[in-house]
Amino acid sequence: MELKRRAWRSLHIWKNRKVAEVSLTIDDFREVRGTKADAEDVINIPRLAAGNQIALFFHQLPDRTRETRVSIRTRAPYDAIAVASRFGGGGHARAAGCTIKGSMAVAKRQLRRAVKELLLG
């Protein structure tokens, strides 16, 4: 439950409410002794943000300190796989994911750029 509270506190909404994102760091997992299973449905937090079309969940796992995992959920007409595949990820049109080498700041910067390009069409 504490991981979800931390995710809610990280909620960031941008691009005129079209995009909502949350994040959990390695420290978040360690401090609350959270597991990957504890974070399974955290992607639903940004999906609940009113009016958003794209939900992003950035998280670092304790066993993979130099990577950031990203879960992507979209509503039509946006395609989640169009973003994830740019980073070697997979999935389908409404739900996809990828792993980006580097810090969370690097991953956010790269993913946000890809999402902005998707929104521009």
Predicted ranges, named:
Residues 1-86, 91-121:
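Hydrophobic helix-and-loop "lid/oligomerization" segment in the mid-to-C-terminal part
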